From Swiss-Prot:
Keywords: Cytoplasm. InterPro entries: DUF896. It comes from the Bacteria. It is found in: Cytoplasm. GO terms for cellular component: cytoplasm. Its main location: cytoplasm. Belongs to the UPF0291 family. It comes from Lactobacillus delbrueckii subsp. bulgaricus (strain ATCC 11842 / DSM 20081 / BCRC 10696 / JCM 1002 / NBRC 13953 / NCIMB 11778 / NCTC 12712 / WDCM 00102 / Lb 14). This is UPF0291 protein Ldb1355. Signal peptide: none annotated. The keyword Cytoplasm applies.
Amino acid sequence: MTEADQVRKRINELYKKKQESGLTEAEEAERKELHKQFIANFRAGFKQQLDSLVIVDDQGKDVTPDKAKQIQKKKVLR
């Protein structure tokens, strides 16, 4: 199980407990920290996908915006 899966699992456990009986202050703080971590991981993965995206028109020509190409060159993706 990856770290992201473990974070997601623990967030879900805390959510269920919150619905059933409520959370202690420590659990609520843990939930907030896990949520921040989850969002940061999601954003990093999404940004990586966008950074490696190549846009191609109907004729097969690369029409990726120049700004995206520059980012890809800096990260050695092109």
